[in-house]
Amino acid sequence: LTQYHGWTLLFHEGVTVQLRKLQEAARRAEQNDPHGFESNANVKLFRALSHLIMEAVPSDPARDEFRQGNTLGTAYRHWRRAKIGRRFRLFFRYDSKSKVIVYAWVNDENTLRSAGSKSDPYALFEKMLGRGNPPDDWDALIANARSDWRES
């Protein structure tokens, strides 16, 4: 199991798919431009996500800055989100008793933050929760998560 700062990290497919895409895009960028790849948008996003997943969130998942209030509606206030710049959101839940964090979904370049838009990540994630993918129920969420995002 992957552990950081004493927390076990689990990944739902909604985040694993995006992480794999970004990792591959970052790898291609490095191959295509070994000296200038660090300025590539995919490389920057992958590094920012990696930092959030392994450092910022596990250092204190209860931090106020991760609360999303009623943006997803009152039924989903227990979901948290970490911001990457102004347009990307990483959604997760945690359980302080079992010390588990489940990363559920991160939006992509087709679903950038834009309040009121149908493709806004909050609107899309709320619909996804309503359809049960990812599950809102903690036990179901854990059952549908994996410990290594690199595995298919």
Question: What role is predicted for each listed range?
Answer:
Residues 1-10, 16, 20-31, 71-152:
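Enriched for short, Lys/Arg-rich terminal
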Residues 29-35, 66:
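A short small-residue
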Residues 35-48:
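A short, highly charged nucleic-acid-interacting micro-segment common to nuclease
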Residues 51, 55-83:
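A short, surface-exposed loop/turn module that caps and links secondary-structure elements
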